[in-house]
């Protein structure tokens, strides 16, 4: 059986105030990990007009100049003058950082071997993968991310000098659901809102973004005469960034993950060192899901992990393939159990998570980028019997579109 439906995902640029905060929090984390790979970091950032505040708990041997660090990130994003809405040179940087609670430290990592470290908190984490794109990510989100990335590439290289750092994109795709798989058919609607300088007309802005960004990013085969484009539908967007809206770390968790597909456990990523399973276990769940899909064992996979604070072994592991696998969910679960050690210490070791790699994750999504280790599929341990069953019952063809 098959049916058609619409699904929408959104993305925001690095100049969106919430994303600014994510990048600053992860820059703080990277600065500590660069000097002290065992640093324990939980750093939140808040921003509003002319102000950035860091707050949280950090236990580290590193010495970090937060004033220099915060201003460097804001300058990189592009807020370099008050006429744009924020100035990295003159903004106030407030610091309210304390040490990690000794009770949490005692329960999680003190006097424990690196591989025996307990989960930094309780919680549930999800991973998702789909064969609809090469990245095993939902096409709605991939296109939303790519629109923002292309827009700001053109801003940075001077091609579109009137574009400013704050923007949002949203893509709606018509899908066909077939045997549990999701097949993109066409782009139904595209929404782009970008901050801009006062000297560009809305007509020029809309024409340029449609021709030089949207139609450059989205394959022509997915666009038709019925596709709807809303470009700055509210009109002018001159006041942006923290002047337009307050920003807080961790408020774009759906943009960070799967664009509304799969599921989300509620925990944000940015500013957290890898002993926090909100981050490391979510990366591991994605690693599991994409490994199964890239191995051809399913067309779509959802993985749920849960943990208790101070306990290393997951409380539960769920593998759900939406009926798209020749194997049962129980058999896929067995492959996962045989192939992955999902304790925090092992996750950190196998994915090499004590490195300063996190600021980049806060810019354009944590998943779907091949440079991140959790995106590289793991060789799976599959019993001869299950391997034979998988080969003998191929996944039904769904003729997914090429991207």
UniProtKB/Swiss-Prot annotation:
- Annotated residues that bind L-methionine are located at 57, 100, 245, 276
Report if keyword Nucleotide-binding is assigned: yes
The metabolic or biological pathway listed in the UniProt record of this protein is: Amino-acid biosynthesis; S-adenosyl-L-methionine biosynthesis; S-adenosyl-L-methionine from L-methionine: step 1/1
Catalysis performed (reactions): L-methionine + ATP + H2O = S-adenosyl-L-methionine + phosphate + diphosphate
Q: Where does ATP bind?
A: 16, 166-168, 234-237, 245, 251-252, 268, 272, 276
Q: What is its EC number?
A: 2.5.1.6
Biological process terms from the Gene Ontology for this record are: negative regulation of lipid storage; one-carbon metabolic process; S-adenosylmethionine biosynthetic process
Entry keywords, A to Z: ATP-binding, Magnesium, Metal-binding, Nucleotide-binding, One-carbon metabolism, Potassium, Transferase
- Which residues take part in binding Mg(2+)? 10
- What does gene deletion cause? RNAi-mediated knockdown causes an approximately 65% decrease in S-adenosylmethionine (SAM) levels, with similar decreases in S-adenosylhomocysteine (SAH), the product of SAM-dependent methyltransferase reactions. Increased levels of lipids, including triacylglycerols. Increased nuclear localization of transcription factor sbp-1 and increased expression of known target genes of sbp-1, such as the fatty-acid desaturases fat-5, fat-6 and fat-7.
**Superkingdom of origin:** Eukaryota
Q: Which residues form a coiled coil?
A: none
Give GO MF terms, alphabetically: ATP binding; metal ion binding; methionine adenosyltransferase activity
This protein's GO cellular component annotations are: cytosol
Which InterPro entries does the entry link to? ADOMET_SYNTHASE_CS (IPR022631), S-AdoMet_synt_C (IPR022630), S-AdoMet_synt_central (IPR022629), S-AdoMet_synt_N (IPR022628), S-AdoMet_synthetase (IPR002133), S-AdoMet_synthetase_sfam (IPR022636)
Quote the record's cofactor note: Binds 2 magnesium ions per subunit. The magnesium ions interact primarily with the substrate.
Q: Which cofactor does it need?
A: Mg(2+); K(+)
Could you say which residues bind K(+) here? Answer: 44
Q: State the family named in the UniProt similarity comment for this chain.
A: Belongs to the AdoMet synthase family.
User: What is the protein's known function?
Assistant: Catalyzes the formation of S-adenosylmethionine (SAM) from methionine and ATP. The reaction comprises two steps that are both catalyzed by the same enzyme: formation of S-adenosylmethionine (AdoMet) and triphosphate, and subsequent hydrolysis of the triphosphate. May be required for the majority of global SAM production under normal growth conditions.
What this protein is called in its record is Probable S-adenosylmethionine synthase 1
Q: Which organism is it from?
A: Caenorhabditis elegans
Q: What is the lineage of its organism?
A: Eukaryota, Metazoa, Ecdysozoa, Nematoda, Chromadorea
């Amino acid at each position: 059986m098959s049916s058609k439906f619409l699904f929408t995902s959104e993305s925001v640029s690095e100049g969106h105030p919430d994303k600014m905060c994510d990048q600053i929090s992860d820059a703080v984390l990277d600065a500590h990990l660069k000097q002290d790979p065992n640093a324990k970091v939980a750093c939140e950032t808040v921003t509003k007009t002319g102000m950035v505040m860091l707050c949280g708990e950090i236990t580290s041997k590193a010495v970090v100049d937060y004033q220099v660090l915060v201003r460097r990130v804001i300058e990189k994003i592009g807020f370099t003058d008050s006429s744009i809405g924020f100035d990295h040179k003159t903004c106030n940087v407030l610091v309210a950082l304390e040490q990690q609670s000794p009770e949490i430290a005692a329960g999680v990592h003190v006097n424990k071997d690196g591989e025996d470290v307990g989960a930094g908190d309780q919680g549930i984490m999800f991973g998702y993968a789909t064969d609809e794109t090469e990245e095993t990510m939902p096409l709605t989100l991939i296109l939303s991310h790519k629109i923002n990335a292309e827009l700001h590439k053109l801003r940075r290289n001077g091609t579109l000098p009137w574009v400013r750092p704050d923007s949002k994109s949203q893509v709606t795709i018509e899908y066909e659901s077939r045997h549990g798989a999701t097949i993109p058919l066409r782009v139904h609607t595209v929404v782009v809102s970008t901050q801009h300088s006062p000297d560009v007309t809305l007509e020029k802005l809309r024409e340029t973004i449609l021709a030089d960004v949207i139609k450059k990013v989205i394959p022509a085969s997915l666009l038709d005469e019925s596709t709807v484009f809303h470009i700055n539908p509210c009109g002018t967007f001159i006041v942006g960034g923290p002047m337009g809206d307050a920003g807080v770390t961790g408020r774009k968790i759906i943009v960070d993950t799967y664009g509304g597909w799969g599921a989300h456990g509620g925990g944000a990523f940015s500013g957290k060192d890898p002993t926090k399973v909100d981050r490391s276990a979510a990366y591991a769940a994605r690693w599991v899901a994409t490994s199964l899909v890239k191995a051809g064992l399913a067309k779509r996979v959802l993985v749920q992990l849960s943990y208790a604070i101070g306990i290393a072994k997951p409380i539960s592991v769920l593998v759900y393939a939406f009926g798209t696998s020749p194997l049962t969910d129980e058999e896929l679960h067995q492959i996962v159990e045989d192939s992955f050690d999902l304790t925090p210490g092992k996750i950190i070791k196998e994915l090499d998570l004590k490195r300063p790699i996190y600021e980049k994750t806060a810019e354009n999504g944590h998943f779907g980028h091949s440079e991140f280790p959790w995106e590289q599929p793991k060789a799976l341990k599959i019993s001869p019997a299950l391997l034979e069953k998988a080969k003998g019952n191929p996944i039904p063809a769904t003729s997914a579109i090429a991207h």
